[in-house]
Each structure stands twice: as structure tokens, then as C-alpha cells.
UniProtKB/Swiss-Prot annotation:
It holds the Pfam family SAM_GIDA_C. NAD-binding protein involved in the addition of a carboxymethylaminomethyl (cmnm) group at the wobble position (U34) of certain tRNAs, forming tRNA-cmnm(5)s(2)U34. FAD binds at G19, A20, G21, H22, A23, G24. Homodimer. Heterotetramer of two MnmE and two MnmG subunits. Its cofactor is FAD. This is tRNA uridine 5-carboxymethylaminomethyl modification enzyme MnmG. GO terms for biological process: tRNA methylation; tRNA wobble uridine modification. SMART domains: GIDA_assoc_3 (SM01228). Disulfide bonds: none annotated. NAD(+) binds at residues 280-294. The lineage of its organism: Bacteria, Bacillati, Cyanobacteriota, Cyanophyceae, Synechococcales. GO terms for cellular component: cytoplasm. It comes from Synechocystis sp. (strain ATCC 27184 / PCC 6803 / Kazusa).
């Protein structure tokens, strides 16, 4: 139920954040650090920043998001660097645009460290409570929240980060129970309040695999997946880097017996049995989906991953399911190495309410209620990193809203988190959204190594980057610039002793002379090769050397992509008048008129990314705007 002011508030805050998962923690920390008195409300104080599925951070596209959150002053990258069990850089044999750092983290340690951080953050209060109602003012602006038991708290901004808890229901086979995740009750009431206010809500599904006792596994039958010898970092702040002993993950595979067992029991699955019809994540399918969709595959990789240093549970990645418990155990015991495994927790599917993010502006403030923001799985995403990125953006803008400042919109050409939010706000998504490198048109520019170069100046301007971090950033950028200048100006000659050595080493001629930058551009030649011939700079840090090499080696491609961005930006940043009557523009297709009226894009670029709006419609819209402009200035 929606309440109208005046309401007697138990306490008054600037910002209230509903939910203390990965989005909620980032949002609350951001608002508190920006000087807002903040209340973080959660169902369970002992489950702050819990990792209910895979305890891992990073991976393709997700690592770029994590680096970007850190570059802006967020927390998730620091958390992974403090609590990792294993780190690996994925896709290292491919180009730098798709390099992806991934960390397996200690589940309990991660939650404990984050809990300590939010508990000790100035301006931030944490309380248990289930928000069921919103308090609005006379102009439908947010003024506070009410909990299930009637406590009211006032605020100028409210951020909803409810994860899978909103109307959550977990399924194992044909059995279900209300729950946000196993062992924790669902949140009720808030969906009905949002519906009352005219918001559209829907249902999505996700799932998590079983956990098995690591003492019951035969490791001799598993293929070890060791960590990288050279540890890489998510955070650009060396102060949070913790060198620690790493652990192995392991690999096994499904067998013909696994596949047959699943086929024989498909009718018992919540999805295939017809018990639920919510859409699940396309890029993280259940094992049943894999067997059905990829029937020609004889086997699927299954990764066995530790959940902590002192935790007996192993996470069975790639084996999520909603089949009954007895079937799950039989399935697990068909995997090599797990023939005698003990299942400690069964896999389950969870369905929950979400609010399609087309009802939000790119600031993540809702279009219907000023001061109300949404972030994380309520917006239709899946993944801790996607949630953290949205939480940070929502937190920044919630703070700026109550401070009377303009809201920040991140462009898709400037960041992965801008791409993520742009997709959410302009596309009618009906399945859980996962960030992929292929979703960005500008991935060569939006690399992990330059996330600080792209976003830390903005983080400083916003107020989340302190003097120490700013000094570190400026020193790093100065070192990179100076080294590039040195490499472009230092020349070696064909007849020099070092020149002859390089020719012998590379089996490529030097015609007269060559600058070191051109040498670095050659395929197969890298910065460590310069160092072999005493032509490197020993004072540079490893991450600075990496950035220098990438910027030189791929300079042609980078310049070409920058040119493309500039060309696209000429029209894409053109703002659309608020309240524009698209239904009156007869040169637009009827579908375009309906979609533009529904989504109310802010710019031409956003309009062009809405499904059903084609290039001809965009041209017609540009012509219409130009005609209106001429009429307005003509005497």
C-alpha cells in the first residue's frame, strides 16, 4: 500500500537503501561517502553481501565492470582482492579487449569483511527490516518507506535492491516454498505497492547447483585447474592487495549416464514439468537446458570449485538444476571423481519479481516516482558484478538527487556499466541480463587496464576518489605518458649491436633504423622482450608496462574506434525534448511511435537502440526535429 505524507517517521535520513546484497552495499557506501545520512535496511544482518550462488568475482565482461566500479571508488574489486582463493586471467591468448580476470572468493570471509566495512562506514546506519510500502508526497515524489511491522523512515531518495527476494519462491522438483534463497524468507508487499503506483512487474528465474563435501571427492579422477603464478588485481589501489596462498579448482565432465538420467527425469523438472514458466538466464543454463538444447554434445565441462579455505563445501559449476533431490544425487554420482560424493546442499531454482528497467531513466531513477531508484536483479540482471555496477550508479545519483545536483548518466561508449544500463533502459528484456563483451561496440577502448583512465577523473569529480587515490592515478598516467614518449623517440639502428641481436631474435629485418614503439607493434614482440635487451624501463610497474604496450600495439585500431565513436556521437547525444508527442509524428512507423511513447528516450542514441525503432525512423525523427527548430527560429 502506498502511504501519503504527512506520516510520523521514526527517523529521518537523506537516502534509504532497501537490501544489503552486492547492489545495496555499493549504493549505501556511495551515498554515505558522498555525505548523505544513509539507512541500509536488510532482512538479515548476518547475510550482508552474501554470495548465494558461485562465490566468484570477474570473468568475461564482468571483470571489466569490476574494474570500472573500482575506478569510480566502489568496493567489489577491493573485496575480491582481499578474499580470493584463486585468481586466473581468462582469454589471455586472445586480444586485450577480452582479457578477463576471475577470482574464486572465500564466501564467508567475503561477507564478513563487507559487513565490517558497512558497519564502520560514517553516515551509514544498518537495520533489519522488510520494506513493504513507500511514502509519497503530494507530487508523487519519494518521502520514505514503511516496514512490514509499521516502522516508517523518511528520506528524499530510496534505492530498491531486493535481489531474488521480492516474491521469491524456490523450487526443487515439483515442491516449492516462499524464499528469497534457501533458508531465508521472501519479501512480500513491495511488489503490490509498485503495482499500485502503475509499475509493471514480471517474474524471472535463476538457480544454483548442489554443494558437495570435499572430503567425499576422488581428486585423482579430476583435472586440476591451478591459479596463475603471477597474481593480477581488480583494484587500482595497491593498499588493498593481499598476497595469499591460492587453491586449485578442478574439472570433470558429464557422461552418457548423466545425460540419460536427466532425459529420463525431465518431466520432474520445474520448467519441463510445467510448474513454472519464468524465463531463466540464457548464458547460465541449467544442466537440463544444456542436455535439451545441445543434444548433439556428448559431454559438458563441470568445474569443481572451493567455497572457502575452512568450508567443506564444493561448488559444482555448470550443474545447476531444479530436479528432485534423489535425482540430483544420482546425477552427481555419474560424474568422474564424484562417484561417492556426499551432497551437503541440494540445487534449486528460484523465481522472483522484477521491474523491467525501461521504467527507469539511465540514472536508474524511476520515471513514475522522483527520488525512487532501482538497482540489481530487480532491474532484470543476473550476477554480482552487474548488481554492484548498478548499485554504485544508483547510489551516486540518489545522493545527487537529495543534494539538488544534476544526475550522472554513463555513456555506452565510455564504459561497460554505461552499456549495461543503456541496454536495460532501452531494450524490452524478458530474461535475466548478463553482461557480455559482445554487447559493447567499443570493447577495444573499454578495456580493464584503462578503466581508471576512463573513469577515475569522474570519480574524483563526483567525490568518491580521495587525495591518496588521486595522487596514485596521476602518477600512473604520467608514467605511462612519459614511457610512450620515450618509446616513440628512442631509435635503434640496424648496425648497432642491439639491433643485430633483435634481428636474430625476431627473424625480422630492421631497415636502417626503427623506433622502439614500432618494434613493440610487431606481432609476437612484447614489453618483456624490450627488457631482454635492456631497452625497457625498470621503474615502471607491471600494470603500467601492460597499458603502454596495449596503447602502442593497438594504436591503429584504437584510433579507428575513437573516430567511429566521434561520428556516432554527433547524432546520438542529441537530446530529445521532454514530453515529445511521438504519436503526432506521422513520418514515424506506428510501432516506432508506440515504442518511443512507451520508453520516452532522452537522446537520439537511446531512441535508436529501442527494439522496433529502425534507422528510417531515426532519420524521420531527425528531420522532424530540424523542421521544428527552423519553425521556432523563423520570424
Amino acid at each position: 500500500m502506498t502511504l501519503r505524507s504527512p506520516v510520523e517517521f521514526q527517523d529521518q535520513f537523506d537516502v534509504i537503501v532497501v537490501g544489503a546484497g552486492h547492489a545495496g552495499c555499493e549504493a549505501a557506501l556511495a551515498t554515505a561517502r558522498l555525505g548523505c545520512r544513509t539507512l541500509l535496511l536488510t532482512l538479515n544482518l548476518d547475510r550482508i553481501a552474501w554470495q548465494p550462488c558461485n562465490p566468484a568475482v570477474g570473468g568475461p565482461a564482468k571483470s571489466q565492470l569490476t574494474h570500472e566500479v573500482d575506478a569510480l571508488g566502489g568496493e567489489i574489486g577491493k573485496m575480491a582482492d582481499r578474499t580470493y582463493l584463486q585468481k586466473r586471467v581468462l582469454n589471455i591468448s586472445r586480444g586485450p579487449a577480452v582479457w578477463a580476470l576471475r577470482a574464486q572468493t572465500d564466501k564467508r570471509e567475503y561477507a564478513a569483511v563487507m559487513k565490517n566495512i558497512v558497519e564502520n562506514q560514517p553516515n551509514l546506519s544498518i537495520r533489519e527490516g522488510m520494506v513493504t510500502d513507500l511514502v509519497l508526497g503530494d507530487n508523487d515524489e519519494i518521502q520514505g518507506v514503511q516496514t512490514y511491522f509499521g516502522a516508517c523512515f523518511g528520506a528524499q531518495s530510496v534505492v530498491i535492491t531486493t535481489g531474488t527476494f521480492l516474491g521469491g519462491k524456490i523450487w526443487i522438483g515439483n515442491k516449492s516454498m516462499p524464499a528469497g534463497r534457501a533458508g531465508e524468507f521472501a519479501a512480500v508487499g513491495l511488489t503490490e505497492t509498485l503495482n499500485e503506483l502503475g509499475f509493471e512487474t514480471g517474474r524471472l528465474k535463476t538457480g544454483t547447483p548442489a554443494r558437495v563435501d570435499r572430503r567425499s571427492v576422488d581428486y585423482d579422477k579430476l583435472e586440476p585447474q591451478p591459479p596463475d603464478e603471477q597474481v593480477s588485481w581488480f583494484s587500482f589501489d595497491p593498499e588493498v592487495w593481499v598476497e595469499r596462498e591460492q587453491m586449485n579448482c578442478y574439472l570433470t565432465r558429464t557422461t552418457a549416464k548423466t545425460h540419460q538420467l536427466i532425459k529420463d527425469n525431465l518431466h520432474l523438472s520445474p520448467i519441463y514439468g510445467g510448474f513454472i514458466d519464468s524465463k531463466g538466464p540464457r548464458y547460465c543454463p541449467s544442466i537440463e537446458d544444456k542436455i535439451v538444447r545441445f543434444a548433439d554434445k556428448e559431454s559438458h565441462q563441470i568445474f569443481i570449485e572451493p567455497e572457502g579455505r575452512d568450508i567443506p563445501e564444493l561448488y559444482i559449476q555448470g550443474f545447476s538444476t531444479g530436479l528432485p533431490e534423489n535425482v540430483q544425487l544420482a546425477m552427481l554420482q555419474t560424474l568422474p571423481g564424484l562417484e561417492n560424493c556426499v551432497m551437503l546442499r541440494p540445487a534449486y531454482a528460484v523465481e522472483y519479481d522484477f521491474l523491467p528497467a525501461t521504467q527507469c531513466y539511465p540514472s536508474l531513477m524511476t520515471k513514475k516516482v522522483a527520488g525512487l531508484f532501482c538497482a540489481g536483479q530487480i532491474n532484470g540482471t543476473t550476477g554480482y558484478e552487474e548488481a554492484a555496477a548498478q548499485g554504485l550508479v544508483a547510489g551516486i545519483n540518489a545522493a545527487r538527487h537529495c543534494q539538488g545536483k544534476s544526475l550522472i548518466i554513463f555513456s555506452r561508449e565510455g564504459s561497460y556499466l554505461g552499456t549495461l544500463i543503456d541496454d536495460l533502459c532501452t531494450k524490452d528484456l524478458r530474461e535475466p541480463y548478463r553482461m557480455l563483451t559482445s554487447r559493447s561496440e567499443y570493447r577495444l577502448i573499454l578495456r580493464s587496464d584503462n578503466a581508471d583512465q576512463r573513469l577515475t577523473p569522474l570519480g574524483r569529480e563526483i567525490g568518491l576518489i580521495d587525495d591518496r587515490r588521486w595522487d596514485l592515478f596521476q602518477t600512473k598516467q604520467a608514467n605511462i605518458t612519459a614511457e610512450k614518449e620515450r618509446l616513440y623517440s628512442t631509435r635503434i639502428k640496424e648496425q648497432d649491436a642491439v639491433g643485430k641481436e633483435i634481428v636474430d631474435y625476431t627473424q625480422q629485418k630492421i631497415k636502417g633504423s626503427i623506433v622502439l614503439a614500432e618494434l613493440l607493434r610487431r606481432p609476437g614482440f612484447h614489453y618483456p622482450d624490450l627488457e631482454k635487451f635492456q631497452l625497457g624501463n625498470e621503474e615502471l610497474k607491471p600494470e603500467e608496462k601492460t597499458s603502454v604496450e596495449i596503447e602502442i600495439k593497438y594504436s591503429g585500431y584504437i584510433k579507428r574506434q575513437q573516430t567511429q565513436i566521434e561520428q556516432v556521437s554527433r547524432h546520438s547525444q542529441k537530446r530529445l525534448p521532454p514530453g515529445l508527442n511521438y504519436m503526432a509524428i506521422e513520418t514515424l512507423s506506428m510501432e516506432a511511435r508506440e515504442k518511443l511513447t512507451q520508453f520516452q528516450p532522452l537522446t537520439i542514441g537511446q531512441a535508436g537502440r529501442i527494439g522496433g525503432v529502425n534507422p528510417a525512423d531515426i532519420n524521420a525523427l531527425l528531420v522532424y526535429l530540424e523542421t521544428q527548430l527552423r519553425r521556432s527560429v523563423s520570424p
